[in-house]
């Protein structure tokens, strides 16, 4: 019984790990402006994403995508992501230390 429970626990962790990998891979495209792991120098013209609340990041990305938040280039970038990808990005950046 313990082996079965342990196997179920290990298998249940895989979707989370897969989302972490997907978020990290998607976030690589953000590094050019938002810095590696979402950290930027203090004088950067963009905000650091590391450690921001997941819901805030996802809401802002979706607002860029639907055009309700003004932007220079983010509205075009955000259109390339679906809800699941935005959620994975948001979770990954939220998990990074500031």
Question: Where do the PLM segments sit?
Answer:
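The canonical Cys-X-X-Cys-His
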Residues: 28-36, 89
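Sec-dependent signal peptide recognition
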Residues: 1-7
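Detector for the c-type heme attachment site
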Residues: 34-39, 94-95
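C-terminal capping alpha-helices of c-type cytochrome domains
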Residues: 69, 78-98
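Short, flexible, mixed-charge glycine/proline-rich loop motifs
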Residues: 20-24
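N-terminal signal peptide c-region/cleavage motif recognized by signal peptidases
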Residues: 13-18
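Gly/Gly-Pro-rich "capping" loops immediately C-terminal to redox-active cysteine motifs
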Residues: 38-66, 75-79
